[in-house]
Amino acid sequence: MKAYQREFIEFALEKQVLKFGEFTLKSGRKSPYFFNAGLFNTGRDLARLGRFYAAALADSGIEFDVLFGPAYKGIPIATTTAVALADHHDIDTPYCFNRKEAKDHGEGGNLVGSALEGRIMLVDDVITAGTAIRESMEIIQANGADLAGVLVAIDRQEKGKGELSAIQEVERDFACAVISIVSLSDLITFLEEKGDAAEHLDAVKAYRAQYGI
């Protein structure tokens, strides 16, 4: 695990974005942890969050031309990631996001920001069912662009309805890399390093044994 990944987990715990306990997911599964990126909700939080997304992008080595943030949660993520790439990596990246409802006056259309062209890096908080990615792919393809990759904050590394995770299904269906700032494996490593989180560690390991990929 890299330093920025460890720092991200500490940041998420500090902001209560990441919690350990018992949580019922939409799927009905009882999860020993929960991640709610909506709690990164101040200017300083967003600035820090962007630096972690930018670090993961730089670490990945994936080449792309435009950052795309799907409405609504992806919008601030794309914005802060673009700022962090400029400020900390000297990379001036165009960014773009979509409107949920197309506008029929002013500049019109359903895209705001840069033109959606070339190789697109989609940024979002998590992938649960892959629905948002599929909707975004329709927009990307309609503009004649290609999906270079997808970056999310956390990869839960758990099966969906079949044997694959939602992320693996996206990788299979769209032939692109899906990367994350951290994964379930990183959370386990973090808990092991802490040494005083045996209760949470056992619960997370048991969950991975049941649902992990």
From Swiss-Prot:
Q: Which InterPro entries match?
A: OPRT (IPR023031), Or_phspho_trans_dom (IPR004467), PRibTrfase_dom (IPR000836), PRTase-like (IPR029057)
Q: In which pathway does it act?
A: Pyrimidine metabolism; UMP biosynthesis via de novo pathway; UMP from orotate: step 1/2
Q: Which residues cross the membrane?
A: none
Report the sequence similarity comment from the record: Belongs to the purine/pyrimidine phosphoribosyltransferase family. PyrE subfamily.
Q: Output this protein's name.
A: Orotate phosphoribosyltransferase
The record ties this protein, via PROSITE patterns, to: PUR_PYR_PR_TRANSFER (PS00103)
Q: Which cofactor does it need?
A: Mg(2+)
Instruction: Report the GO terms under cellular component.
Output: cytoplasm
| Single annotated GO MF | orotate phosphoribosyltransferase activity
Show the SUPFAM superfamilies listed in the entry: PRTase-like
Q: Where does 5-phospho-alpha-D-ribose 1-diphosphate bind?
A: 26, 72-73, 99-100, 103, 105, 124-132
Which proteins does it associate with, and in what oligomeric form? Homodimer.
Q: What is its EC number?
A: 2.4.2.10
What keywords appear on the UniProt entry?
A: Glycosyltransferase, Magnesium, Pyrimidine biosynthesis, Transferase
Reaction(s) the record says it catalyses: orotidine 5'-phosphate + diphosphate = orotate + 5-phospho-alpha-D-ribose 1-diphosphate
Q: Which GO terms describe its biological process?
A: 'de novo' pyrimidine nucleobase biosynthetic process; 'de novo' UMP biosynthetic process; pyrimidine ribonucleoside biosynthetic process
Residues bound to orotate are F34, F35, T128, R156
